[in-house]
Amino acid sequence: MPKIFRSLYVQVLIAIVLGILVGFLFPSFGEGLKPLGDGFIKLIKMLIAPIIFATVVSGIAHMRDTKKVGRVGGKALIYFEVVTTFALVIGLVVANILKPGHGMNVNPATLDTSAISKYTQAAGEQSVADFLLHIIPNTLVSAFTEGDLLQVLLISVLFGFALTQLGTLGQKVLAGIEAVNSAVFVILGFVMRLAPIGAFGAMAFTIGKYGVGTLAQLAYLMVAFYATCLLFVFVVLGLIARFAGFSILKFIRFIKEELLLVLGTSSSESALPRLITKLEYAGANRSVVGLVVPAGYSFNLDGTSIYLTMATLFIAQATNTHLSLGQQLGILGVLLLTSKGAAGVTGSGFITLAATLSAVGHVPVAGLALILGIDRFMSEARALTNFVGNGVATLVIARSEKALDTNRLQRVLNGEVLPPATPEVAAEERGEGRGLDGPLPA
């Protein structure tokens, strides 16, 4: 086999193209390939809980200074809130300028709401108190068996703090956890070999079930959304990255394999373990990566934030529902809260949108039926934007903590293949971060 075809990047790219062709030419057959994509994502999700647990626990235990843990967590939450607010505002502004729903003149009473009933029902059941209580698992084990990211994160933080109080015994327990984590990453390497199959099945199903022709009527919204996500990544995140001392273009090239995996599966979670590995390899301190990345997957959903404001205004425009500036700002305020409630919920984007429309009362909830058919096609842009945003956030916060080896980062982003980063003790003596404990997987 030629060397180029051994690259995961090339294999996934070929799989995506083949999936599109199969779904287009043989729709029924393509729709039947859904288990391939679902199976691959389930294999990845099977590993996410133990990886996040070990990564967060290791990060907190290695910091030892509880004040530093609080400082990093505080910086992360402030960063997430500011950047996601920017994303919400950008979506609002673009939707007002482009008016993707203008001229559709849809009567909400004529829409079939049966397909969206499960989303509106879930939205009505999710209050703020329910969301906060949901973070607390019923048992220590249930968080892992259910794969709830927020619950795993809570247990991991508590466990990490507990180990810092156990002295020598805590170090022994930590060594065992890190050994298990190493084994999990070996399993991840096995699973990643199946990535092209998963991407092929997921893409064939998407095109086979929804088709390309059905997108024509709503194509303007999709194009506007994709363009807005690109604008956000290259302008907003690009400026943030430049301020932090690295190029967004080089960073995207560095994570290109992971981005293709996200594109093929429409799930940013599918590449979460590899993002952790690559950020450590690039010179970010393990303790910062372990705290920021899992938290970002729950609270730093830039792509989802853009989607929420654009979809809300699209429905209002399509149903001829006039929204004053005050009402739009009110929707923005509600979204600042409800967008955080999307964390760890299956179908989170649609449920959060339904919750927002129900809360504000100005926009007909029945309008959700307009975008249900194309929501699956917009999920790729949401997932890609969320993924890049979390990578940038981690590097920015690591640099602010002097936990980033900037020289190593530049060399890695310039395409150099480096050995594992220097040992942690030597890195801490220089005030720099530490990299990966092993070679970067292909």
From Swiss-Prot:
Keyword RNA-binding attributed: no
Disulfide feature: none
Name the UniProt record assigns to this protein: C4-dicarboxylate transport protein
Domain of life according to the entry: Bacteria
InterPro entries for the chain: C4_dicarb_transport (IPR023954), Na-dicarboxylate_symporter (IPR001991), Na-dicarboxylate_symporter_CS (IPR018107), Na:dicarbo_symporter_sf (IPR036458)
Subcellular location: Cell membrane
MF annotations from Gene Ontology: fumarate transmembrane transporter activity; malate:proton symporter activity; succinate transmembrane transporter activity
Example of a GO biological process term: L-aspartate transmembrane transport
Renumbered residue ranges of the record's region Disordered: 420-442
Family label: Belongs to the dicarboxylate/amino acid:cation symporter (DAACS) (TC 2.A.23) family.
Keyword field contains rRNA processing: no
GO cellular component annotations of the record: plasma membrane
Family matches, as HAMAP family: C4_dicarb_transport
Matching Pfam families: SDF
Membrane topology: Multi-pass membrane protein
Gene3D superfamilies: Sodium:dicarboxylate symporter (1.10.3860.10)
Transmembrane region(s): 10-30, 40-60, 77-97, 149-169, 185-205, 221-241, 288-308, 354-374
